[in-house]
């Protein structure tokens, strides 16, 4: 199973004092050296952490794939076409939220998402959609004219209040995505404890983890924390 390390909150720390450090690029390089399979960043509309120049620097400099999380806006799609990351992940976004609060509403967005997927594919960019583990939402993937390359299942509800029922919803969602012939990832709120559970779910091929890793890195160092997470996922 692959590990995608989200380095947004390295930029949060930098921006808190308006300094040039800590550098997200350096964090990405350390994470990759420790075993990260790809790097994820979320370029939010308000630029509260990652900035445009961070994204361009990462694309130019890192040795692994770059996954760019963005809202489904024209501004962000144009930036994606200029950066040309390995993949983009379309996420819902509200300015007042502290973090992404849920998955996309595929039911009401399937027409718009179809055109976005086609547009990105024409620029050789893979597309991931961030979706709750809700089969009623996932069924609408079949209405998309062009399939996304990846579905990332939102694990926040499970990670905030774990239960076997919620874990089963994620398992069922991953199985459904696999039957559609789409790669399945998972992310949001994952810790070491949750990662152990996620690795037992068939069909999930990657985890995206950010806030927890950066938080643990304050005490134990980023290299050590990423390495430990990779070992946790391997075991």
Curated annotation (Swiss-Prot):
Gene Ontology terms: cellular component: cytosol
Binding positions (1-deoxy-D-xylulose 5-phosphate): 8-9, 44, 49, 99
CDD domains in alphabetical order: PNPsynthase
Compartments where located: Cytoplasm
Pathway assigned to this chain's UniProt record: Cofactor biosynthesis; pyridoxine 5'-phosphate biosynthesis; pyridoxine 5'-phosphate from D-erythrose 4-phosphate: step 5/5
Main location: cytoplasm
Active site: 42, 69, 188
Catalyzed reactions: 3-amino-2-oxopropyl phosphate + 1-deoxy-D-xylulose 5-phosphate = pyridoxine 5'-phosphate + phosphate + 2 H2O + H(+)
UniProt site positions, description: Transition state stabilizer: 152
Keywords: Cytoplasm, Pyridoxine biosynthesis, Transferase
Binding site for 3-amino-2-oxopropyl phosphate: 6, 17, 189, 210-211
Any single GO BP term: pyridoxine biosynthetic process
Keyword GTP-binding tagged: no
E.C. code: 2.6.99.2
Sample GO molecular function, one term: pyridoxine 5'-phosphate synthase activity
Subunit: Homooctamer; tetramer of dimers.
Family membership noted in the UniProt record: Belongs to the PNP synthase family.
General function of this protein: Catalyzes the complicated ring closure reaction between the two acyclic compounds 1-deoxy-D-xylulose-5-phosphate (DXP) and 3-amino-2-oxopropyl phosphate (1-amino-acetone-3-phosphate or AAP) to form pyridoxine 5'-phosphate (PNP) and inorganic phosphate.
UniProt-recorded name of the protein: Pyridoxine 5'-phosphate synthase
Species of the source: Wolbachia pipientis wMel
Protein encoded by which gene: pdxJ
């Amino acid at each position: 199973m692959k590990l995608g390390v989200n380095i947004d909150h390295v930029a949060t720390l930098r921006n808190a004092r308006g300094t040039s450090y800590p550098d997200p690029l350096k964090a990405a390089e350390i994470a990759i050296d420790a075993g990260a399979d790809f790097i994820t960043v979320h370029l939010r509309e308000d630029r509260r952490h990652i900035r445009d120049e961070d994204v361009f620097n990462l694309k130019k400099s890192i040795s692994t794939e770059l996954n760019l999380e963005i809202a489904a806006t024209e501004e962000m799609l144009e930036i994606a076409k200029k950066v040309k990351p390995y993949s983009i992940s379309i996420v819902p976004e509200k300015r007042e939220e502290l973090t992404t609060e849920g998955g996309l509403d595929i039911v009401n967005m399937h027409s718009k998402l179809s055109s976005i997927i086609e547009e990105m594919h024409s620029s050789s960019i893979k597309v991931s959609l961030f979706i709750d583990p809700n089969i009623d939402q996932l069924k609408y993937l079949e209405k998309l004219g062009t399939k996304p390359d990846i579905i990332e299942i939102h694990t926040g509800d499970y990670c905030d209040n774990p239960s076997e029922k919620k874990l089963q919803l994620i398992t069922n969602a991953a199985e459904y995505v696999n039957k559609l012939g789409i790669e399945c990832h998972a992310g949001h709120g994952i810790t070491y404890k949750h990662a152990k559970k996620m690795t037992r779910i068939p069909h999930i091929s990657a985890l995206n983890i950010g806030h927890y890793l950066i938080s643990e890195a304050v005490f134990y160092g980023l290299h050590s924390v990423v390495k430990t997470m990779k070992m946790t996922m391997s075991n």
